[in-house]
From Swiss-Prot:
GO biological process, one term: gluconeogenesis
Database matches in InterPro entries: His_Pase_superF_clade-1 (IPR013078), His_PPase_superfam (IPR029033), PG/BPGM_mutase_AS (IPR001345), Phosphogly_mut1 (IPR005952)
UniProt entry tagged with the keyword rRNA-binding: no
Keyword Cell division included in the entry's annotation: no
EC number: 5.4.2.11
Top-level taxon of origin: Bacteria
Keyword entries, A-Z: Gluconeogenesis, Glycolysis, Isomerase
Annotated catalysed reactions: (2R)-2-phosphoglycerate = (2R)-3-phosphoglycerate
Record protein name field: 2,3-bisphosphoglycerate-dependent phosphoglycerate mutase
Role noted for this protein: Catalyzes the interconversion of 2-phosphoglycerate and 3-phosphoglycerate.
Gene3D superfamilies documented for this protein: Phosphoglycerate mutase-like
Active-site residues, record numbering mapped to chain: H8 (tele-phosphohistidine intermediate), E86 (proton donor/acceptor)
Annotated site residue numbers, Transition state stabilizer: H181
């Protein structure tokens, strides 16, 4: 069984080196090219899908659309869930990463970005950036909407969705593609591969490059490779 993971193509805020999180930004032109290239490589590799999953953020949705279009699979059913969203960067969202490092120190910013269990500064309740002000989250219990997340909290929302919704599709023999985000995919990869809390700090997933897993019957990886050529 094969599972394909794709981090969205470069976004406008990736290009500007800004913390993005749940802020909804579009793909950059380079990101569009990355997504289209991913779709072409998937087609060349002969990978076919029966069902697709993505977040509710534009950059991931558009990446998936380009992938399916370029691989001639636009008809594949797509399921969107906030549980596949990027990690919520709290009050860091919208700030420049380099300027934040100069203000707080590179070590502190590295912990906010890469540590498994260090939370970023949280959004204030009345901050206009709160996700509760966004219509796509209005049906969620307000207690489920974060004001900031670390990777641990991100994993705690991603993995139940994997277990309850995605994994059963794979076990039924359906071929799955997931287009999501750097940290929601890091959380899933950590779970699939059994990566330790310390080792996960060093894992980087490139934008717009399909990551193919070959899974056994227990959905444990027996092989993985990037479609980067």
């Amino acid at each position: 069984m094969k599972l394909v993971l794709i981090r969205h193509g470069q976004s406008e805020w990736n290009k500007l080196n800004l913390f993005t999180g749940w802020h909804d930004v579009d793909l950059s032109q380079e990101g569009v090219v990355e997504a289209m290239t991913a779709g072409k490589r998937i087609k060349e590799a002969g990978l076919e899908f029966d069902v697709a999953f993505t977040s509710v953020l534009t950059r991931a949705i558009k990446t998936l659309n380009y992938v399916l279009e370029e691989s001639d699979q636009m008809w594949v059913p797509v399921h969107k869930s906030w549980r596949l969203n990027e990690r919520h960067y709290g009050a860091l969202q919208g700030l420049n990463k380099q300027e934040t490092a100069e203000k707080y120190g590179a070590d502190q910013v590295q912990k906010w970005r890469r540590s498994y269990d260090t939370l970023p500064p949280l959004l204030e309740e009345n901050d206009e950036r709160q996700a509760k002000n966004d219509r796509r989250y209005q049906l969620l219990d307000t207690h489920a909407i974060p004001s900031g997340e670390n990777l641990k909290v991100t994993l705690e929302r991603v993995i139940p969705y994997w277990m309850d919704t995605i994994a059963p599709e794979i076990k039924e023999g359906r071929r799955v593609v997931i287009a999501a985000h750097g940290n929601s995919l890091r959380a899933l990869v950590k779970f699939l591969e059994g990566i330790s809390d310390d080792e996960i700090m060093d894992l980087e997933i490139p934008t717009g490059v399909p990551l193919v897993y070959e899974l056994n019957d227990d959905l444990k990886p027996v092989n993985k490779y990037y479609l980067d050529k």
